[in-house]
Curated annotation (Swiss-Prot):
Protein name as catalogued: Elongation factor Tu
Originating gene: tuf
Region: G2, residue numbers: 60-64
Molecular function GO terms recorded: GTP binding; GTPase activity; translation elongation factor activity
Annotated region (G3), positions in chain: 81-84
Length: 396
C-alpha cells in the first residue's frame, strides 16, 4: 500500500504526557486517540499498543518511547509517551523528543508525587515552555474540597519551578471513563476540554527557518581562485549571498561576508534550516576557522565556558562507565560538531555520581563554545559516550 502523503495543511506541534508512574499518562494518551477518532482526527490506539513502546537508541542511549499522532480542528500533533520513569528522564535530557508543550498528568486521588516534581523540574531545565494539567481519576474522589486542595498543590508546585501556576489550565477528568465510552463531563467531555486547552494555551512554535541563522562548521576547504568554504548542515534560519555572519566559538569571534552558497555542487540563492551547504567566506584563509565553530547571524549567539547543566549518566548496560565519578571529573563535552574538555562541579550535598544517575552539575570548559540555554551535548571519554546533557543556564 502506498504511503499517505503527510498533509501540511495545519500547524504542527510536538507534545507529550509527563507525570508520576501510574497516574494515567498512557491511559490518557489512549483516551485522546479514542475520543479524537470519532471525528476522524486519530486512529484509536489501545493502552497496550502504546505501552509496549519499542526501544530506540538516541546518542547511544536506549529509550523506550511511544509516538502517537492525532489532529484537532486547528492542529496536527505528534505526541510522545514513555513507559518508564527512566525513559522520561533520558528522553527529556537527550532532546530525543523535543516538546513544544507537555500535558502533566496528576492523579486526583494521590496528588503530586516525587516524579511529578521531578518531571516539572526537568521540563524547566530542558526548556519545555508550556504545561497543561490533566487531573486524572477524579471519579475516585467524592469530596470536591479535596480536589480543590490537590489543584492548589499542583499550582504551587508549578510556581516553585517558575511555571505560571495561577494561569495554567487544569482539566479534571477520568481517562479510564473516557476509554470506557463515558460521554459525561469527566469522560469524553474532559478529553475534548483538555484538547481545547492544549490548542489554545500551547502556542504554535516558531519554525526553525524563522529563527536567526546558525550553521555548525563540519569542515573547511580552500578552493583555488574562489576562497575558503565552510561546510555543514544549517541548524536554523536562512542564509543568503551577501549577508554578514560571525564565526563564533573556540577562537575570538570574527566577522565575514557570505559570497556564495552551494548545495550538491550547485549555486543557491539561499540555504535554509535542514540544508547541507558549503558557504564561501570573504577574506578568510583555510586556517582562520575550524570544525566546531559556528557561522551565525551577528549577535545571535555568544561563546561561553561556564554553564549549569542537567545530565543523565549512562548505565554500565548502556555502555557507560562501570564506576562512579567525583568532583573535578574531566571528560570531553561534545557540542554540535566538536569535543571540548571541561571540569565538572557537583552540587554541595553530592559526593559522587553513579552510572544511571540524573543530576544537575556545573561545568567549566577549557575553550569557549557557541552556546545557549537548551543546547544538548554528549559527555565522552576517549570517543565513547558516557552521558548526555542539556544546558540549563549560562554562568559565563
Amino acid at each position: 500500500m502506498a504511503k499517505e502523503k503527510f498533509e501540511r495543511n495545519k500547524p504542527h506541534v510536538n507534545i507529550g504526557t509527563i507525570g508520576h508512574v501510574d497516574h494515567g499518562k498512557t491511559s490518557l494518551t489512549a483516551a485522546i486517540t479514542k475520543v479524537l477518532a470519532k471525528t476522524g482526527g486519530a486512529t484509536f490506539l489501545a493502552y497496550d499498543q502504546i505501552d509496549k513502546a519499542p526501544e530506540e537508541r538516541e546518542r547511544g542511549i536506549t529509550i523506550s518511547t511511544a509516538h502517537v499522532e492525532y489532529q484537532t480542528k486547528n492542529r496536527h500533533y505528534a505526541h510522545v509517551d514513555c513507559p518508564g520513569h527512566a525513559d522520561y528522564v533520558k528522553n527529556m535530557i537527550t532532546g530525543a523528543a523535543q516538546m513544544d508543550g507537555a500535558i502533566l498528568v496528576v492523579s486526583a486521588a494521590d496528588g503530586p508525587m516525587p516524579q511529578t516534581r521531578e518531571h516539572i523540574l526537568l521540563a524547566r531545565q530542558v526548556g519545555v515552555p508550556y504545561i497543561v494539567v490533566f487531573l486524572n481519576k477524579v471519579d475516585m474522589l467524592d469530596d470536591p474540597e479535596l480536589r480543590e486542595l490537590v489543584e492548589m498543590e499542583v499550582r504551587d508546585l508549578l510556581k516553585k519551578y517558575e511555571f505560571p501556576g495561577d494561569s495554567i489550565p487544569i482539566i479534571p477528568g477520568s481517562a479510564l471513563k473516557a476509554l470506557e465510552g463515558d460521554t459525561s463531563d469527566i469522560g469524553e467531555g474532559a478529553i475534548l476540554k483538555l484538547m481545547a486547552a492544549v490548542d489554545e494555551y500551547i502556542p504554535t512554535p516558531q519554525r526553525a527557518t524563522d529563527k536567526p541563522f546558525l550553521m555548525p562548521v563540519e569542515d573547511v576547504f580552500s578552493i583555488a581562485g574562489r576562497g575558503t568554504v565552510a561546510t555543514g548542515r544549517v541548524e536554523r534560519g536562512k542564509i543568503k549571498v551577501g549577508e554578514e555572519v560571525e564565526i563564533v566559538g573556540i577562537r575570538p569571534t570574527q566577522k565575514t561576508v557570505i559570497t556564495g552558497v552551494e548545495m550538491f555542487r550547485k549555486l543557491l540563492d539561499e540555504g535554509m534550516a535542514g540544508d547541507n551547504i558549503g558557504a564561501l567566506l570573504r577574506g578568510l584563509k583555510r586556517e582562520d576557522l575550524e570544525r566546531g565553530q559556528v557561522l551565525a547571524n551577528w549577535g545571535s549567539i555568544n561563546p561561553h565556558t561556564k554553564f549549569k547543566a542537567q545530565v543523565y549518566v549512562l548505565s554500565k548496560e548502556e555502555g557507560g562507565r562501570h564506576t562512579p565519578f567525583f568532583k573535578g571529573y574531566r571528560p570531553q563535552f561534545y557540542f554540535r560538531t566538536t569535543d571540548v574538555t571541561g571540569t565538572v562541579k557537583l552540587p554541595d550535598n553530592v559526593e559522587m555520581v553513579m552510572p544511571g544517575d540524573n543530576i544537575a552539575i556545573e561545568v567549566e570548559l577549557i575553550t569557549p563554545v557557541a552556546m545557549e540555554k537548551e543546547l544538548p551535548f554528549a559527555i565522552r571519554e576517549g570517543g565513547r559516550t558516557v552521558g548526555a546533557g542539556v544546558v540549563a543556564d549560562i554562568i559565563a
